[in-house]
Amino acid sequence: MKLSEIAEFLSLEYKGEDIEISALNSLLKANFAELTYCDGEKNTKDIPHTGAAAILVSKEYENLVPKDTKVLITQSPHLSFAFLSKLFAKPLINTAKEKVQNIAKSARIMPNVYIGDNVNIGENVIIMAGAYIGDNVSIGDESIIHPNVVIYNDTKIGKKCHLLANCVIGSDGFGYAHNKNGEHYKIYHNGNVILEDFVEVGACTTIDRAVFDSTIIKAGTKVDNLVQIGHNCNIGQNCIIVAQTGISGSSELGRNVIMGGQSATSGHLKIGDFSTIAARGGVSKNLEGGRVYGGFPIMLQKDWLKLQAKIAMKFKKD
C-alpha cells in the first residue's frame, strides 16, 4: 500500500516521496518497508533509533524522527494506528479451495476436528474431538490437543505439549484506541503465539497473540486452568502459573517464576528469575529475582504478613 494512500485513508496531509508500505511494526523492529507509530512520551526515546520507512507521530515529536523516515503528523498516533491496523490485518478465514497439510502418519485425529491450510502435525500427535486448528499452525511431535481446544492461525506448538480442554491459543489481544468521545476502536493483531517444548496449558486458559511479534511461553512452563496471558508476554522457562492468574500484556517473567492462585500483574513489567508471587499478589512494578512477594501493593511476603498481623492487633485492641 502506498504511503499516499495511507495518508488519504487517515485524512492526513502528506506531500513527500511516495513509497510502498508492506506492513506495520513496532518502533525498534520496523524496517525500511514498514510503518510504525509513537503513542506517548515514554516511547519518544526510541524514535531516533527507528529503522521504519514511515512513522505516525504527533507534531511535538517530529524533530526526533530520523531524516530517512517519512513522517505522517497526527493528533492521535495510537488512534490512527488502530484505524490502519484493520487495513493490514491478516484474513481470519482462508478462502483457498484446496488445503496443503503435512500430517504425520502416526498422528491420531479424532472426529469433528477442523484443520486449516498449511498445517504441520508431527509424529504421534493426538488431537481430540472438536478441536480447531487454524492456518499456518505447527504442532510438534507427541503433543496432545484435548477436546474443543482452539488454536488460531500462525500458532507454533513445540514437542510434547499438553493443551487441555477448551483452552484458546492465539486469539486477538485486548487492545483498543479511544477517541475524544470515549469510543473504542479495535487494534488488529498480526503476531502469533509460540509454545516451546514441554509446555502444558490448563483447561479454559487463554493466551493472546502479539500485536506484531510473538507471545512466547518458554520450554517446560506449566499453566493451570482459567489463566489469562495477555498479548506480547514473554514467559520464561519452567514457570508455574496457578489457576485464575492474570498476566497483563507485555509482561516478562524470568525462568522458574511461580505465580500463586489469583495473582496478577499490570503490563510492561519484569519479574526476575526464581521469584514467587503469593496467592492474590498484585504486581505493579519490576521485581528482583530470587525472592518471595505478596500482597498489594506488592512487597516481600514476610513484610506483608507482618503488616497483616499489625492490622489485626490494632483492631483487636480497639
Curated annotation (Swiss-Prot):
The active site is at H231. InterPro entries: Hexapep (IPR001451), Hexapep_transf_CS (IPR018357), LpxD (IPR007691), Trimer_LpxA-like_sf (IPR011004), UDP_GlcNAc_AcTrfase_non-rep (IPR020573). GO terms for molecular function: N-acyltransferase activity. It catalyses: a UDP-3-O-[(3R)-3-hydroxyacyl]-alpha-D-glucosamine + a (3R)-hydroxyacyl-[ACP] = a UDP-2-N,3-O-bis[(3R)-3-hydroxyacyl]-alpha-D-glucosamine + holo-[ACP] + H(+). Keywords: Acyltransferase, Lipid A biosynthesis, Lipid biosynthesis, Lipid metabolism, Repeat, Transferase. Its EC number is 2.3.1.191. It is an enzyme of class 2 (transferase). Pathway: Bacterial outer membrane biogenesis; LPS lipid A biosynthesis. Gene3D superfamilies: Hexapeptide repeat proteins (2.160.10.10), MurE/MurF, N-terminal domain (3.40.1390.10). GO terms for cellular component: membrane. GO terms for biological process: lipid A biosynthetic process. SUPFAM superfamilies: Trimeric LpxA-like enzymes. Catalyzes the N-acylation of UDP-3-O-acylglucosamine using 3-hydroxyacyl-ACP as the acyl donor. Is involved in the biosynthesis of lipid A, a phosphorylated glycolipid that anchors the lipopolysaccharide to the outer membrane of the cell. Belongs to the transferase hexapeptide repeat family. LpxD subfamily. Homotrimer. This is UDP-3-O-acylglucosamine N-acyltransferase. It comes from Campylobacter jejuni subsp. doylei (strain ATCC BAA-1458 / RM4099 / 269.97). The gene is lpxD.
